[in-house]
Design a protein with these regions (language model features):
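Terminal low-complexity/charged segments
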Residues: 1-179
């Protein structure tokens, strides 16, 4: 494979992958159906040299009722990165674990379970507290989590807080004469 487009053509012949989005010549993204993600990831690692899992992250598309997982892989020999995106329903946010393919994925999966509520059955230590010790509310990275309500219920007001509103502060910095 010499280009991302050639790699995409090969992947399309093997898996039902979506359109290729090229950010830069060395960085592209493709959407993969949930049920084909693991086999696509394994192929990319074993056959195409994408040996490094750079990151695993999520986006909460609240209005669409979806989570988007992005698995960013790197082929260090070729100096290229490929992101695989998979969409999950928010009300059934479960994805197969890939900790056996990339052991570091277990850490990312623990974080995503804790911060978004996405489940990765079989992932090691998945249900142990990771960052949010004693957390009882909905996962805080979900867009329906009310940060302001949580802050008001959890923290006391302190003097001077009302004078440090970021919008007011920036307005004073940018327009010191009140213009």
């Amino acid at each position: 494979m010499t280009t991302m487009r050639e790699l995409h053509t090969l992947l399309q012949s093997l898996f039902p992958v979506g359109e290729l989005t090229v950010q830069r010549p060395e960085l592209a993204f493709v959407t993969v159906p949930k049920e084909h993600l693991r086999s696509t990831l394994v192929h990319l690692r074993v056959k195409e040299g994408f040996s490094h899992l750079v990151l695993l992250t999520a986006v909460d598309w609240l209005e669409e009722g979806l989570f988007q997982l992005t698995y960013l892989l790197s082929n260090r020999t070729r100096g290229v990165d490929l992101g695989l995106r998979v969409m999950l329903p928010r009300d059934a946010a479960t994805m197969e674990s890939i900790h056996d393919v990339w052991p570091t994925a277990a850490t990312y999966q623990r974080e995503l379970r804790e911060m978004f509520g996405i489940d990765f059955p079989g992932s090691p230590r998945l249900h142990e507290e990771f960052i949010l010790e004693g957390w009882k509310d909905i996962p805080p990275y979900r867009r329906d989590f009310d940060t302001l309500k949580y802050a008001r219920e959890s923290y006391s007001e302190r003097p001077g807080r009302e004078t440090h509103d970021p919008a007011t502060h920036m307005k004073q910095q940018l327009y010191p004469n009140g213009r």
